[in-house]
Amino acid sequence: MKKLIFLRVFGCFIFSFAAFSAANANPAPGQEKFTVKEVPAFSYCCLPCQGPYTNMETKIGELTQFLQAQNIAPMGPLIGIFYNDPNVTKPENLNWEIGFPVMESNVQDPLRFRQWTFTTVLEGTYTGPYEKSAGIYAEMMGWLEANGYAPAGPILEKYLSDPNSTRPEDYKTEIWIPCRKK
């Protein structure tokens, strides 16, 4: 039931972003795979989470129920914000958030209203099943190092595909790694 609720809510918001994700899915010939860019700060509503990422589906279901109960309208695609490196942090100690950009600030427990203030990011797009995305993070971290940048905040993922109508191998995820020049 929770999965069905999530999939319906998630699907409604994803369709408005389909054109954006299609236009930015793959770099054109001659373009970089990763780009350092300035992005606007934004507000988001999230459910803070601790534990393994395998809990994400359950947490998304909880998030959508809390959003509905509080009449909070998402203003963009589902996002995940990740504070730890799963290669060095035990799964039970991982801190992360799952949420949506929002306009409202009247958010009640257990949800939190937060500001994304990291405006310089390295952006990359991953296509494929979520559980096989680890390689792009190593590539992005390597790109930062090779180009004189250092990570400067938590990783943000924007989920641009509708899981109701998209095969896992075609899922598109936009990834932001906040960064600064060394």
What are these model-predicted stretches?
Residues M1-G11:
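Bacterial N-terminal signal peptides that target proteins for export
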Residues F6, F15, F20-K182:
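A solvent-exposed interaction/effector surface
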